[in-house]
């Protein structure tokens, strides 16, 4: 049986938002003995942030069969979870999965998170730099993005859709310039990386439909409940995208139509940045096997299994 001839230690399934990568990962996991999913999503770690992040725990259930999942709902909303913490938590889960002779499937759209474990870069907690922050505060998001684009290292953050996150990303870059670090002792992971390739216009249509579905299914109420729980508008706006725009709508900074229009544009731009990151991963030496998102699911699963086994 090909179950005994697996060629890889781990499978990574990546793709932009609305590509269907999570449901594909679940279907692959159900057809691979002992498979468990490790989420690589920078926002699905937060409890209570479900609709806005596209986190649907029911998606991990198929006909009564539950696929074990990790790194979902591990941090309280309002806190800030970073790449260093993800690497730490990933290694703990990865070691546990391997010790139990299970098979890890990493799935997510945060290319930075995925690449950080595939390449094994050492990351340290980065302290705040008040002087640098003050010097950057007057710059626009566009100017900050231009500054970020000049850095060549792995540590750039593709989720910089707010000034605060862009400034933090620059702060991290400057810290690593001043305090270079060596690679940490990551396990050597022989990983098969699969990308879900979705046509740009198809992706745009899915994003638009999904946004309106989420708005109809309680996303505004979700954000309102987070605010009522004591989380400040500033804390929610930090997370960007849905939480930024819906918070601005709820506190009266945007009309409903302005919120929907602005958010839709921002999500399209985010998906484009995700794809740019994945293409960059390829240039940095990560081989990604691209699979057409429009193929029948059974065919997608078989293609991945053909790559996974001898």
Feature locations, PLM:
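Phosphate/pyrophosphate-binding catalytic cores of soluble transferases and nucleic-acid-acting enzymes
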Residues: 1-310
């Amino acid at each position: 049986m090909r179950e005994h001839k697996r060629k890889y230690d781990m499978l990574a399934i990546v793709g932009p938002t609305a590509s269907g990568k999570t449901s594909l990962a679940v279907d692959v996991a159900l057809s691979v003995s002992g498979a468990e999913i490790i989420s690589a999503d920078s926002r699905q770690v937060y409890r209570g942030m479900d609709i806005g992040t596209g986190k649907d725990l029911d998606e991990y259930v198929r006909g009564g069969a539950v696929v074990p999942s990790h790194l979902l709902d591990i941090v309280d909303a309002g806190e800030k979870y970073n790449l260093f913490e993800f690497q730490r938590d990933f290694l703990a889960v990865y070691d546990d999965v391997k010790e139990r002779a299970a098979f890890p499937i990493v799935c997510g759209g945060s290319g930075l998170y995925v690449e950080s474990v595939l390449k094994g870069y050492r990351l340290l907690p980065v302290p705040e730099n008040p002087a640098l922050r003050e010097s950057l505060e007057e710059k626009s998001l566009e100017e900050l993005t231009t500054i970020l684009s000049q850095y060549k290292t792995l540590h750039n953050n593709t989720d910089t859709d707010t000034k605060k996150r862009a400034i933090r990303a620059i702060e991290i870059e400057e810290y690593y310039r001043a305090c270079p670090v060596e690679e940490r002792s990551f396990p050597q992971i022989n990983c098969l990386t699969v990308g879900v390739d979705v046509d740009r216009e198809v992706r745009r249509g899915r994003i638009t439909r999904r946004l309106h579905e989420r708005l109809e299914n309680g996303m505004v109420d979700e954000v309102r409940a987070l605010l009522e729980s004591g989380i400040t508008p500033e804390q929610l706006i930090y997370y960007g995208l849905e939480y930024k725009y819906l918070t601005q709508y709820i506190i009266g900074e945007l009309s409903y139509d302005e919120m929907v229009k602005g958010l839709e544009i921002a999500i399209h731009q985010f998906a484009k940045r995700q794809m740019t990151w994945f293409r960059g991963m390829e240039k940095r030496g990560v081989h990604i096997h691209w699979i057409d998102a429009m193929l029948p699911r059974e065919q997608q699963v078989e293609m991945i299994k053909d790559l996974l086994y001898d």
